[in-house]
Design a protein with these regions (language model features):
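Helix-to-loop junction immediately C-terminal to a conserved catalytic motif
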Residues: 51
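ABC-family P-loop ATPase nucleotide-binding domains
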Residues: 82-137
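The feature captures the beta-strand-to-loop junction immediately N-terminal to the Walker
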Residues: 33-38
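Short coil-to-beta microelement around the adenine-binding A-loop and adjacent beta1/P-loop entry
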Residues: 17-18, 70
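Conserved ABC transporter NBD signature motif
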Residues: 58-72
């Protein structure tokens, strides 16, 4: 198996607080891992670095052999912990955006997952509960054929 993710000596500081201190890990393609730790231990910080959302860190992160950037984002499917849709949007708008943005997005799979969650593409984001929005976001990220 090939190395899908390699994190080497990553340190991230927020002013004087070290959120990550010399973290190293590898993940082989085809493997599933859990990232466990107490609140404030740097799990979210590490995930954001891997996704290219945080840039000011020390060390090296390689995704499929490449530095974090535009190419790595194409093979990562990320579920943020906050809603990132605009209230005026409809589900069908977001489906169209995802289809345009991600070559690996499987719209039919997304619609199947949405059906399981009892979500309709005619629904307006503003009218959805927090739980419904979370189910929709999960449907979106699970419908990409991303490597990571």
């Amino acid at each position: 198996m090939s190395e899908l993710l390699k994190v080497t000596n990553v340190t991230k500081k927020y002013h004087h607080f070290k959120a990550l201190n010399n973290v190293s890990m590898t993940l082989e393609s085809g493997k599933i891992i859990g990232l466990l730790g107490p609140n404030g231990s740097g799990k979210t910080t590490l995930i954001k670095i891997i996704n290219g959302l945080l840039k000011d860190y020390e060390g090296e992160v390689l995704v499929d052999g490449k530095n974090v950037g535009i190419d790595s984002r194409k093979i990562i499917s990320y579920l943020p912990d906050e809603n990132y849709f605009q209230d005026w949007m409809y589900i069908k708008d977001v489906l169209s955006i995802f289809s345009d943005l991600y070559e690996d997005f499987d719209k039919e799979n997304c619609l199947t997952l949405m059906n399981r969650f009892k979500l309709d593409k005619g629904m307006k984001i503003k009218e959805m509960s927090k739980g419904m929005k979370e189910k929709f976001q999960l449907s979106l990220v699970m419908s990409r054929k991303a490597k990571l």
